[in-house]
Amino acid sequence: VRGVHVALAVSASLLLWADRYSDLDLLVADWMFDHASGTFPWRGAWLADRFNHAILKSWLQVLGVATLAVAAWDWWRPRPGWTASRRIGLRVLASAAVLVPTVVSLLKRVSASHCPWDLQRYGGSEPYVRLLEAVPAGVSSGHCMPAGHASGALWLLALAVFWLPHQPRKAAAAGAAMLVFGFTVGWIQQLRGAHFLTHTLWSIWIAVLIVDSLYRYFAPVPLKKL
């Protein structure tokens, strides 16, 4: 558990540095942008636009609602034979299905960052504004960070909790798989020009923080003392 907190602190510092002092986001977006046509080629691609942004999003929303329904039913009428770890896992997963997308959405509302496809650099009309940088006079906030679409998949990180605390390796494998899945969803959005790399990475950071906090909240008392 302490290792997670150290990883969160270190990764937050690295992300803040990358946002403020590096051109990582621009370098990745430049690579994805076709300067000859002046477009992000994947913006209208079926896989990126129709499947990833619409179909997959709907599937994940249905899965989230189903998870909430099962958790609510078990809370109202606890299923006999369910272990404490399974019940904790279900409650963490259901809570994450709500909190991860909600927190990311609320942070987007106060974000100044614009999406790549809105920037002058990529054929749009807005200037590039770094994290914590003041928005130039006359320029509206972009509300594009963190990555909202990725957060719709990143709540599945909570699946790792079903193997805790007795099978940490399986928990780590499940968590890693879901992080890769969430990152892939975010990466495809980046190919469309909808987000920068750090937008997706901040969503991952937030998801890890929320899932860790939920597990500590729902877990048995001995775990909370770690």
Region spans (language model):
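Cytoplasmic juxtamembrane regions at transmembrane-helix boundaries
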Residues: A69-A94, W163, Q167-A177
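Hydrophobic alpha-helical transmembrane segments
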Residues: L56-D74, H149-V161
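Membrane-interface loops
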Residues: L27, A84-H166
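Alpha-helical transmembrane spans of integral membrane proteins, capturing the lipid-embedded, hydrophobic core
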Residues: L8-A12, V62-L63, L93, A97-P101, ...
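Alpha-helical membrane-inserting segments
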Residues: L14, A18, D25, L68-A72, ...
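Membrane-embedded catalytic cores of phosphoryl/pyrophosphoryl-handling enzymes
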Residues: R2-L8, V129-L226
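Aromatic-anchored segments of alpha-helical transmembrane domains
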Residues: S13-W17, V98-V103, L179-Q190
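N-terminal transmembrane-helix/juxtamembrane module of multi-pass inner/ER membrane proteins
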Residues: V1-L68, K108-S111, P116, E126
